[in-house]
């Protein structure tokens, strides 16, 4: 009996101990709220350096975070709280900006309104909405530090609100991203709208994601999580976030 206990004790000593400083794996919380006002949260450990709002695209599969979960979990590991507003219950079925604002406001309250910069990233329709959202976030007392617009879509002014960019804070940094196998029409439209509103050109950068090897830089490449997506999409967002901390 004593010999068995001693053997167990020695085995326990030989096993690697868990590091007390190791952060827990990112955990999705929610959805909180109802209908188009619903949202999901992820919390950085031990405390956030930034809050990132992730605006999704126009598709049934985008109404929950699973298309972007790898990118979101990467952001959490980098020290960001993340908010994923649902903003609609069917594609183009709700006033996207209104429900985004409601979801973001209640999410920030749930997070305790951390006194850190807020960055918005959006994909496809959400890429355009991300810039428009930054222009109306003053309504919930938020001054966004930066926006990354990934493969933004064009505006259908018959169905969607036309946002006046004159309220977009001139301190906000904008990064508009296009792909070499995707239409740049949405980014060009955003640039024209920004110029008309006299937004400072020096606060706007553009980047092109390039096809490389088996990586095809088309509209759906933002849903990938391989090495090229990480290098050409994840890393630029990481740098943008770091620049406003």
Where are these regions (language model features)?
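Primarily recognizes the serine-hydrolase "nucleophile elbow" in alpha/beta-hydrolase
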Residues: 109, 115-169
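N-terminal cap/lid segment of alpha/beta-hydrolase-fold proteins
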Residues: 18-47
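C-terminal catalytic histidine-bearing segment of alpha/beta-hydrolase fold enzymes
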Residues: 201-245
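Short, surface-exposed "cap/lid" segments of acyl-processing enzymes
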Residues: 45-75
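Conserved alpha/beta-hydrolase
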Residues: 72-91
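The feature captures the conserved acid-bearing segment of alpha/beta-hydrolase catalytic domains
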Residues: 145-213
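Alpha/beta-hydrolase active-site loop
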Residues: 91-112, 132
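Bacterial N-terminal signal peptides
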Residues: 5-14
């Amino acid at each position: 009996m004593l010999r068995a206990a001693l053997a167990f004790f020695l085995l326990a000593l030989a096993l690697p101990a868990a590091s007390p400083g190791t952060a827990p794996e990112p955990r999705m919380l929610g959805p909180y709220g109802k209908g188009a006002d619903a949202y999901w949260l992820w919390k950085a450990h031990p405390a956030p350096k930034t809050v990132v709002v992730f605006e999704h695209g126009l598709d049934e599969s985008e109404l929950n975070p699973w298309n972007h979960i790898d990118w979101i979990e990467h952001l959490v590991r980098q020290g960001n709280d993340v908010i994923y507003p649902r903003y609609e219950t069917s594609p183009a079925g709700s006033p996207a900006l209104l429900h985004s604002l409601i979801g973001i406001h209640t999410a920030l309250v749930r997070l305790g309104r951390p006194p850190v910069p807020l960055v918005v990233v959006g994909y496809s329709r959400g890429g355009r909405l991300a810039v428009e959202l930054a222009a109306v976030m003053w309504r919930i007392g938020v001054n966004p530090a930066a926006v990354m617009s990934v493969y933004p879509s064009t505006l259908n002014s018959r169905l969607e609100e036309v946002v006046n960019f004159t309220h977009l804070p001139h301190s906000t940094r904008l990064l508009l991203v296009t792909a070499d196998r995707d239409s740049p029409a949405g980014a060009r439209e955003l640039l024209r709208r920004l110029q008309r509103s006299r937004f400072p050109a020096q606060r706007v950068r553009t980047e092109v994601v390039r096809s490389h090897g088996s990586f095809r830089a088309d509209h759906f490449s933002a849903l990938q999580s391989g090495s090229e997506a990480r290098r050409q999409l994840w890393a630029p967002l990481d740098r943008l976030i770091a620049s406003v901390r």
